[in-house]
Amino acid sequence: MAEKKGSSSEKTLYCSFCGKSQHEVKKLIAGPSVFICDECIDLCNEIIRDELPTGDAGREGRGDLPTPAEIKTNLDHYVIGQEKAKRTLAVAVYNHYKRLRHKDKAGKDEVELSKSNILLIGPTGSGKTLLAQTLARQLDVPFVMADATTLTEAGYVGEDVENIVQKLLQSCNYDVERAQRGIVYIDEIDKISRKSDNPSITRDVSGEGVQQALLKLIEGTMASVPPQGGRKHPNQDFLQIDTTNILFICGGAFAGLEKVIENRTEASGIGFGAAVRSKKQRSLTEVFQDIEPEDLIKFGLIPELVGRMPVVTALAELSEDALVQILTEPKNALVKQYSKLLAMEGVELEIRPAALKSIARKAIARKTGARGLRSILEQALIGTMFDLPNVSNVEKVVVDEATIEENKAPLLVYREAAKTA
């Protein structure tokens, strides 16, 4: 029963399975002398889903989503150390995207899974931003990074929080469906903390007000975004973006938070049975392991915002050995990058172990962490990279400890002789 002739000369097509005409269904798909309607296709999909064994259904639910172990392994290629943070992030991100797949297929009576946004706490240059970027790249989801210090309340000069959603849309070419499953990283979240425990008469347009605006975005709201990056004005059609399924990762150094934690833990450790341990004996990493939500509230984050970020993980301060590893081991390690740059000039780069340790010590002294490594190495090589295009027969550039510590020029090894300059 594929086709029948009506009173007119044109043919009316019918579904070969249910017999409905093309006018009774949304879509009719043609095969060799047969047709099937969209309703019959939906029915077939339901039958297949219902008859799948439990194990297969679980695998289908996960699809190509990497497991926490696979996510962590990928993070290991780019981020050195921070084992606890990587494991926590891997599980949180895996559960988030598993939750989205469950939500798509869940019935009305099934358990609803809540979103768990993430708060990363750690010193400058410890890898907070790199962790978020690497995650988004691995999962192939839209990613945007925002700076909390540029945000102000709506109506004031500066960016309002909906600009974050607009940037996320731009990153995926205004594909609303993809944007609604993206990742947003908000850096410097600690800089918008309340300046005082007491409410002020003056407006705090970049502090608590921004936290309140971010709260709505993080917990889930319909954000109105002008199409294709235009400015908001009346009588304009807006794109409506549901932020409920966007994963928010917030990061900050939280300088001074260690004092809040120490004051709380010391207050609870008073008495004859309390362990006596001086403040200097505990590193920043150790102190951050004792963090509680009440410490973040005391620091200046509003309780509602703290409650929307249940996954809190602290990143450790990077040691000298860890910084040396960062210089040499990751896929995009700085030494590999500069070696490639010099290789384009036909020159080999050698950075001696003592020089690597010296670079790491300088970064620690500057309190810039891994972020400061590039500027130290750039400073050591800038003169050589300026001269190399005009110098012939250079085979190798050698950076030793004196280059870093005493600002001496790197050694140049020439092809025709082993002389150095």
Curated annotation (Swiss-Prot):
InterPro entries in the record: AAA+_ATPase, ATP-dep_Clp_protease_ClpX, ATPase_AAA_core, Clp_ATPase_C, Clp_protease_ATP-bd_su_ClpX, ClpX_bact, P-loop_NTPase, Znf_CppX_C4
Keyword field: ATP-binding, Chaperone, Metal-binding, Nucleotide-binding, Zinc
One GO CC term, this protein: HslUV protease complex
Record carries keyword Zinc: yes
SMART domains per UniProt: AAA, ClpB_D2-small, zf-C4_ClpX
GO MF term list: ATP binding; ATP hydrolysis activity; ATP-dependent protein folding chaperone; protein dimerization activity; unfolded protein binding; zinc ion binding
Gene3D superfamilies xref list: 1.10.8.60, ClpX chaperone, C4-type zinc finger domain, P-loop containing nucleotide triphosphate hydrolases
Amino-acid positions noted as binding ATP in the UniProt annotation, renumbered to this chain: P123, T124, G125, S126, G127, K128, T129, L130
Pfam families hit by this protein: AAA_2, ClpB_D2-small, zf-C4_ClpX
The keyword Glycosyltransferase is assigned to this record: no
All copies of domain ClpX-type ZB, residue ranges: 3-56
Binding site for Zn(2+): C15, C18, C37, C40
Any Gene Ontology biological process: cell division
PANTHER family named among the record's database cross-references: ATP-DEPENDENT CLP PROTEASE ATP-BINDING SUBUNIT CLPX-LIKE, MITOCHONDRIAL, ATP-DEPENDENT CLP PROTEASE ATP-BINDING SUBUNIT CLPX-LIKE, MITOCHONDRIAL-RELATED
Function: ATP-dependent specificity component of the Clp protease. It directs the protease to specific substrates. Can perform chaperone functions in the absence of ClpP.
Complexes and interactors: Component of the ClpX-ClpP complex. Forms a hexameric ring that, in the presence of ATP, binds to fourteen ClpP subunits assembled into a disk-like structure with a central cavity, resembling the structure of eukaryotic proteasomes.
Protein family membership: Belongs to the ClpX chaperone family.
The protein's name in its UniProt record: ATP-dependent Clp protease ATP-binding subunit ClpX
Organism for this UniProt entry: Acidovorax ebreus (strain TPSY) (Diaphorobacter sp. (strain TPSY))
Lineage: Bacteria, Pseudomonadati, Pseudomonadota, Betaproteobacteria, Burkholderiales
Encoding gene, per UniProt annotation: clpX
